[in-house]
Amino acid sequence: MTLENRPDEAGSPDNGEGTAGPITPAMLEAAERLAGINFTDAERRTIADTMDEQVGIFARRVKMGELPNDLAPALVFRALPPGRALDPVTSTGDPGLIVGKAGPCPADETDIAFASIGELATWIRRGDLTSERLTDIYLRRIDRLDPELHCMITVTADRARRQARAADAALAAGEDRGPLHGIPYGAKDIVDVEGIRATWGAAPFRDRVASTTATVIERLDAHHAVMLGKTAVGALAYGDIWFDEKCRNPWNLEQGSSGSSAGSASGTAAGLMAFSLGSETYGSIVSPCVRCGATGLRPTFGRVSKAGVMSLCWSLDKIGPITRRTVDTAYVLAAIQGLDPRDPSSVGVPFASDPERPIEGLRIGWNPAWFESAGDADRAVLDHLRRSGCRMVEVDLPTLPWESLLVPLYAESAAAFESLTRDDRDDEMVWQAPEAWPNTFRRSWFIPAVEAVQSDRVRRMAMNAMAEVMEKVDALALPPFAAGLLLITNATGHPTLVLPTSEDGSTPSGGFTFIGRLFDEGTLIRLGRSVEQGLSPRTLRPPLG
């Protein structure tokens, strides 16, 4: 195929909206600074003579109209590097089995609200508690506490009560759908539920009503889980500022919850729901869980379907659970994971979990440099791992320009919301700081195409480097933001479990992360369960009214 003699290109092509006149050598010379390259005057003249054709190609694509947000690029990211077999896993158990023992159902409704999924599920099956009563407990807490927390965008009380009554009736008829049967939860407001507002946390979309239902919601519905409503999300999945408010940290109402799974972390930590759905592109589960004292599991890329969920970066977005206890993440992941034809990046790899299995003998990768600024709570986790019989293996990653891994995030997000920028609707966004999305989308238009491809090649290098490291260990242990591994592992697709840490046993002091091999979330859950039992046996409760 050639570009010569195209019959529709007689004369000067349409350069597209916003392009005034021909591209000149002087324009190209100024643009060279953006690309970090230099051409001669003669080269610039030759380029300028041929640029109209290139700009015309772009303009004709724009005239197609807005592309739907859920239309993924033709090239689909796979976390498993080509030629590599699946990593071994250390778990074989059924993640749907309720582990641990539940005592009597407490009389105090606050104690019920902060109970684990396993405890709630046991009480419901004993007949000590109904889903309808539990749902009402959470709805009352939302009514009372959300005016301070601003963690809910839409409360679906009527739908929740209908689901709760149906769950109770099904259980009474002998139909048990597993640990999540009758358990109330919140869904981050980038997740669609047909007929319900899904605002993406952004003013331009505040009146958007979903016309389809996300796969994750369909799967939770099938388990008779009860959706309480849509949790606050930083606008277009960044930060904790949404179109009406700033979601608050339940431990410090003067502070934002971080984000972008802002309301999911805040509401779960505050006992407004038993669990929630979050998402992460670059820190959006890990960061708010650290801030709010919640537990979060970012699954392997492709493990959980994104169909019916707002796309920010098609090759980076991941859906995962936020809970108050580690084993609860296993129950939720077991329900929502699995192959989905609606999501081209979805994969079908079995998920197993043995949370009660001892961690003795597990190989834990770490590096002293990762803990140079660590606090006592972080070092206590390392001590626990050693006492429990883990083999500590010092590891390191090669020196690479890891910041290049941000380029796909910038480019994909700007593409996902191109029309927002072109139509000047980005001006409607509440957060307009230099680091906020409106400015990031605008400057991403100046990423050179060659640089976008080269950054993707650096991403392949990162995948290979992580694969070599994970051949030596079963998991990595580190503070959440150490050594750039939050960025690296989001780019490579590796799973991460984040746990709250506490210096005094009653208030969160930060968080700790375990990074696992691809599709081996079960090992992370074993580790997290062991750390909880050894260091944090009590659920942290914010001092709310």
Where are these regions (language model features)?
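Short glycine/serine-rich loop segments
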Residues: 212-336, 479, 490, 494-513
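A short helix-breaking turn/cap at a secondary-structure junction
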Residues: 98-103, 298-379, 534-545
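Gly/Ser-rich catalytic/binding loops embedded in alpha/beta enzyme cores
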Residues: 39-282, 380-383, 388
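Short helix-loop capping/hinge segments that flank enzyme active sites or metal/cofactor-binding pockets
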Residues: 98-109, 180-200, 358-367, 407-463, ...
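Gly/Ser-rich, acidic/histidine-flanked active-site/gating loops
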Residues: 106, 110-116, 146, 182, ...
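Acyltransferase
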Residues: 128, 133-139, 165, 169, ...
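Glycine-rich, small-residue loops and helix-cap segments
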Residues: 127, 182, 188, 222, ...
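Mature N-terminal segment immediately following signal peptide/propeptide cleavage
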Residues: 21-49
